[in-house]
Amino acid sequence: MELQTTVHIAPSARQITYQDHILLLGSCFSDSMGEKMDCCYLPHTSNPYGTLYNPLSIAQAIETQSEEPWIVRDKGLYHSLLRHGSFSNTDETRVREAVAASREQMAQALAKATVVIITFGTAWVYEYEQRVVANCHKLPSSAFTRRRLTVSEIVAAWKPILARYKDKHFIFTVSPIRHVKDGLHENQVSKAILLEAVEELTRKDPPCPSRTPSDSPYRGGEEKNLPSSIDTNSSPSLCREGRGVSYFPAYEIVLDELRDYRFYAEDMVHPSAQAVQYVWERFVSTYMSPQTLQDMQTLHRFYQKKHHRILHPDSEESKRFLQQLAEEEKKLKTMFNL
C-alpha cells in the first residue's frame, strides 16, 4: 500500500560535475538551492540581480547586459526597478555602483556558466511606464499596472535565449512557494501558466532515458523519516530533457509528494528546511554524476568541520584540529580548484 503520491524522476543524461559552473536565477527557491550548493562548494553564482520572480524580468537579466539602472526616488530612498530591494539606498551613487557591479557579475557568471537553473515564481507582473519591473519597492500602487503574462509571452521571451546559448544546459523549475497575496485562485492560475510555458519550451525535446537513480549522499540523520524515492522504471517520469533544456519538478515534489503542512514553514507558504533538503536530495540524485556525489560528500564533510564551533581555541587539541583543517583546505583547493 502506498500512502503518498510519488513524483518519479529519471536521472538526467546531462550530469553535473565540479568542472561545471552553475548560474541560478529566479525566485527565492533558487536562493535556497544556492545555499545547498554553498555547503558542498559546488561552483555557482546565485541571483546577481537579487531575487527575481517573473519570467520576463529573469529573461531581461540575461538579455540586457548594458541597460540603464532605471532608478526612481521615493521616501528618501533610491531604487532600481530592475533589481531587488537589497540594491536600494539613500545614496543614488551607491545604487548606481551596486547596479554596475551586479551587471559585471552577471556577465562573468553567464560567460563561464555551463548549467543555468531558472526558477519561475509568478506569472503576475507590474508595469511602470509600460515596462515590466522586477520589483515595486513599495512605491504607490497607483504608479503601476498589474497584469498576468500569457504563455505565448513567456515562450517568446525565452526561445531566443535558449537558441543563443546552446552551449549551456538550462534547467527550468517552477517555485512551489505560493503567492497568497495574489489570492489562492489567482496563484493557481499563475502557476498553471508557468508550467504550460515550461512545457512548451521543452516540448520538442526527446524524453530523458529511464535509469535507476543513484542514492543521495544526504539521506539519513534528521531527514531519515522523509518519503523515499522510488525506482523510476516503474512509472512515467516528469523529467523532460533534450541536449540543452530540461525541467525539474520541484513544484510537484512539494505540492504532491510532500502534501502535508509539516513540510511548510510557520507562514504556511514557504517550504520548511526539511522540505528544501528533500527537494535538494531529489535534485542531486537526478543531475549529479557518481563521481560528483563522492566529491560532494568529501567537501560537505570539510564544510561541516570548517564551520564547527570551537569552544576552547587555545587548547592543544583545538590547535591541532585547526592545523589539520588548514592542511586539508589547501589540499582540497588544489584538487577542486576552489
Say what each PLM segment does.
Residues 209-212, 220-221, 239-243:
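Glycine-biased, low-complexity coil/linker segments
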Residues 88-100, 134-158, 178-186:
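Surface-exposed cleft-lining segments at the edges of enzyme active sites
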Residues 118-140, 169-171:
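A short mid-domain helix/strand-loop element embedded in enzyme catalytic domains
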Residues 2-111, 312, 319, 326, ...:
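Basic, amphipathic N-terminal segments that precede the first structured/catalytic domain
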Residues 98-116, 158-164, 201:
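Short amphipathic alpha-helices and their capping/turn segments at secondary-structure boundaries
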Residues 192-204, 245-260, 282, 296-298:
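Extracellular serine-dependent O-acyl
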